[in-house]
């Protein structure tokens, strides 16, 4: 029943370009008993629409966050982060902030993957190998994006005031902050 309703909503959204699909909580255990591969709305919608260009984003009055990766085990996050992935996610986020939120020149803060955003390669290499090169390319294309920020200080009062959205590398890096501020 739940998947049938979600399928119907997806089809209606695809056929009417002026609509949006807003999802809410659902009982994943019930769905997984029917579809063992179900991990969440984002992945399911991506599968149904056969789209590579998807972004999981949550927004409240206080904060907008998006995810580079979605519902994957933490052990798989580092190997999933690539320059191409970061570029794709930031471009989608930047475009959606302009079109859906009417923000002329979005300010996007990107979190690093590792503690202290890797400390210039001392704590992991993902920032140096993938994240920073992606952000430099995006800046050359005039996208207003930060260099990788340490997650433990990214959500300072100043950053919250001057940022239109944050891109986190994984699910539980940014969602707890959004939920603490907004629920």
Task: Show the residue positions of the predicted features.
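Anion-binding alpha/beta catalytic cores of soluble intermediary-metabolism enzymes, centered on
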Residues: 1-183
């Amino acid at each position: 029943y739940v998947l049938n309703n979600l399928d119907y909503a997806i089809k209606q959204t695809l056929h009417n370009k002026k609509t949006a699909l807003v999802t809410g909580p659902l009982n994943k255990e019930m769905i997984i008993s029917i579809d063992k591969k179900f991990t969440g709305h984002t992945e399911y919608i991506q599968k149904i629409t056969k789209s590579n260009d998807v972004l999981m984003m949550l927004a409240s009055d206080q904060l907008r966050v998006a995810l580079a990766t979605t519902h994957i085990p933490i052990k798989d996050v580092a190997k999933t982060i690539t320059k191409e992935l970061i570029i794709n996610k930031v471009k989608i986020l930047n475009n959606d902030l302009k079109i859906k939120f009417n923000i002329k020149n979005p300010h996007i803060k990107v979190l690093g993957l590792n503690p202290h955003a890797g400390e210039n390669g001392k704590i992991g290499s993902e920032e140096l190998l993938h994240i920073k090169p992606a952000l430099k390319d995006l800046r050359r294309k005039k996208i207003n994006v930060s260099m990788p920020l340490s997650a433990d200080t990214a959500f300072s009062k100043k950053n919250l005031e001057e940022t239109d959205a944050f891109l986190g590398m994984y699910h539980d890096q940014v969602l707890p902050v959004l939920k603490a501020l907004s629920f």
